[in-house]
Design a protein with these regions (language model features):
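Edge beta-strand at a domain terminus
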Residues: 190-259
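A short, Trp-centered hydrophobic/proline-enriched beta-strand micro-motif
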Residues: 34-47
Length: 259
């Protein structure tokens, strides 16, 4: 595939070669998002576990929408900004909750919202590592993070977290002339306790696990998420820039304490 094909996505058949820099970059953009500029969304459903010395205990469920705002491909890189909006829910219901009975501490916890972004990502072809089994292809994106996980960013204690996102699809879908393809996302995140769980004196970590799919329209969004986003009234789904100031679930919680 030549540069013109890369920029237009105009190729068909069995020509895609993931060992080629231009093909790999095109396939990456198409699998994760779009080979053209525009927005794509993932609906995520997951569970947070308390990972204790005695084993893992399910704490709470969560649902969110992950938004990628993709820029047009160039010869060297692909770029996008990401945002996330969502909520926590009980283990037996998909409806949002603002507090829950922590099964580890037997205390009532007041919860935050799930919110993140804008996060900017730029990736070149030499950073992309494909795995393939028959028609199945996937990419892993491990990420070690270092930061302050307590109730204040002024806490001198630096701790580590680890996230791994996996995007999986079909080579045959990447090989057509469309600008986007179906994708399944698996997300895993291990970190110190977030302060709203009030477990800073308990040995262990929290483990977030979620699975989601790339969706094509608002009608594909689960009703509980539609209702949540409508109540937020920030046009999250339709806007390419739903908010300006960078935040995270942890920072959003900290900011809420100051209001």
């Amino acid at each position: 595939m030549d540069r013109r094909d890369l920029l237009t996505g105009s190729f068909k058949g069995n020509d895609l070669n993931l060992g080629s820099s231009s093909d790999s970059l095109y396939a990456y953009a198409k699998l994760l998002g779009s080979s053209d500029s525009g927005m794509v969304h993932y609906c995520l459903e997951g569970t947070i576990f308390a990972y204790l010395p005695s084993g893992a205990i399910p704490l709470i469920g969560f649902r969110s929408i992950l938004k990628h705002v993709w820029k047009s491909l160039d010869k060297e890189t692909c770029r996008y900004d990401s945002y996330e909006s969502g909520f926590f829910h009980g283990l037996n219901s998909p409806e949002p909750i603002t507090e829950f009975n922590n099964p580890v501490t037997n205390e009532i916890n007041i919860l935050s919202e799930i919110r993140g972004g804008p996060y900017h990502k730029e990736i070149s072809s030499d950073q992309i590592n494909w795995e393939r089994s028959g028609d199945d292809v996937w990419i892993q994106e491990p990420n070690t993070r270092k930061g302050h996980f307590g109730i204040s960013r002024d806490d001198e204690k630096l701790e580590y977290a680890f996230a791994n996102s996996i995007f999986r699809g079909k080579l045959s879908d990447l090989n057509d002339s469309s600008t986007t393809s179906p994708s399944v996302m698996t997300y895993n995140f291990v970190s110190p306790w977030y302060p709203f769980f009030q477990m800073e004196n308990i040995e262990g970590k929290m483990y977030w696990q979620a699975v989601g799919t790339k969706i094509q329209s608002w009608s594909n969004v689960p009703h509980s998420i539609q209702k949540f986003l409508d109540q937020k009234n920030d046009n999250f789904f339709g806007s390419a820039k739903p908010w300006k100031k960078r935040t995270s679930t942890l920072q959003f919680y900290r900011d809420s304490l100051e209001k």
